């Protein structure tokens, strides 16, 4: 409770940002946390603008998007910034999470910091799915049908949950109103949780590539690391503005530029690229309920990492060869799952997706703890040899 109490001490935030002591050896990999917050703010600001013109009804939702693109002054630019900003937001968060995993940023005393980040990520996925449905294109509608129907597999209460979510016996205006309201609300909750996340970070202090707490090799956050953050933000801003001006629809699916049609089903339903990983796990399991559980567990399992890897003597992955090996294997598994999620459900990709889904959980629950054990043995051998 002490950490949560201090996390709400908002009056200390200004002092914390200016005089926060930061290790001198942290690299640009540590900038993705700030970049994630930056793109979250962009999403909120552009989302508020789009909310002024969006009509959450199955008859006019798609038309209102076209109206924003074609009739509102610079509406196409703001909507492109919102759509592409979501991709950049997830990209930065993924880099941020994998960096934390590689350098063991979840170890004591940062367990609560890691868990708050996982909760933020879970809400991000939900928010992104809700936003994906709102344009009411062909892919949006079918994606909403597939994902919301999964809830019906929950025993006893599944059908009631789906009925409550849909607002009826099928997806209709009430569904879009619900999704619209939740999609507008959740980013503000994400901002609130992000403030807590940052406060927890400033309470425990930042890690560094060496994984060794330092009481002397530290400098104030301002102005040194502010300049690094600003440089990173400017670089990413150039990239997103270039995409937004040259090809704002580059990251969108072609079928989502067709209005939703209840009578036509696309041959291959895919979500946005940043959700393909979860979609691959979902469809790899033939049972609807088990697939839904596996998809949720793929995020929830990240909460147990601080406990199953708490016995690590060496923190940084740079000095743990087995952890480093299993980390890169894990990264390759995640990338392959995302690739499988964008491919039609045919052999051999279906079997490959099932194998990779199993390996994902095996890597987290077995290989990572095993790596700690092996690295400890290697460390003991090294100590014994040097004593001689």
State where each predicted segment sits.
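Membrane-embedded and interfacial regions of multi-pass energy-transducing membrane proteins
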Residues: 1-388
């Amino acid at each position: 409770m002490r950490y949560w109490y201090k996390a709400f001490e908002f009056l200390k935030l200004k002092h914390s940002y200016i005089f926060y002591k930061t290790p001198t050896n942290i690299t640009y990999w540590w900038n993705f946390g700030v970049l994630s917050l930056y793109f979250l703010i962009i999403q909120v600001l552009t989302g508020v603008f789009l909310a002024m013109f969006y009509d959450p009804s199955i008859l006019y939702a798609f038309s209102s998007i076209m109206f924003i693109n074609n009739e509102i002054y610079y509406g196409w630019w703001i909507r492109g910034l919102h759509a592409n900003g979501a991709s950049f937001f997830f990209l930065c968060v993924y880099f941020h999470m994998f960096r934390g995993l590689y350098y063991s940023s979840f170890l004591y005393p940062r367990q609560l910091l890691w868990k708050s980040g996982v909760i933020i990520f879970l809400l991000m996925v939900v928010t992104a799915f809700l936003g994906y449905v709102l344009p009411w294109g062909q892919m949006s509608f079918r994606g909403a049908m597939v994902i919301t129907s999964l809830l019906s597999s929950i025993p006893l209460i599944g059908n009631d949950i789906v009925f409550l979510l849909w607002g009826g016996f099928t997806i209709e205006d009430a569904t879009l109103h619900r999704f619209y309201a939740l999609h507008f609300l959740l980013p503000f909750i994400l901002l609130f949780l992000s403030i807590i996340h940052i406060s927890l970070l400033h309470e425990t202090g930042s890690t560094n590539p060496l994984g060794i707490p330092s009481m002397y090799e530290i400098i104030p956050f301002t102005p040194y690391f502010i300049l690094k953050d600003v440089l990173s933000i400017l670089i990413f801003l150039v990239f997103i503005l270039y995409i937004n001006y040259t090809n704002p629809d580059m990251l969108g699916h072609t079928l989502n530029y067709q209005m939703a049609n209840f009578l036509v089903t696309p041959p291959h339903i895919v979500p946005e690229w940043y959700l393909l990983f979860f979609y691959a796990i979902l469809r790899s399991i033939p049972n609807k309920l088990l697939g839904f559980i596996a998809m949720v567990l793929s995020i929830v399992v990240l909460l147990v990492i601080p406990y199953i890897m708490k016995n690590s003597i060496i923190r940084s992955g740079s000095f743990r060869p087995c952890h480093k090996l299993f980390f890169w294997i894990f990264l390759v598994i995640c990338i392959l799952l995302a690739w499988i999620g964008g491919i039609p459900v045919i052999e051999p990709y279906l079997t490959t997706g099932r194998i990779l889904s199993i390996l994902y959980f095996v890597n987290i629950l077995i290989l990572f703890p095993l790596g700690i054990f092996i690295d400890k043995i290697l460390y003991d051998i090294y100590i014994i040899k040097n004593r001689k």
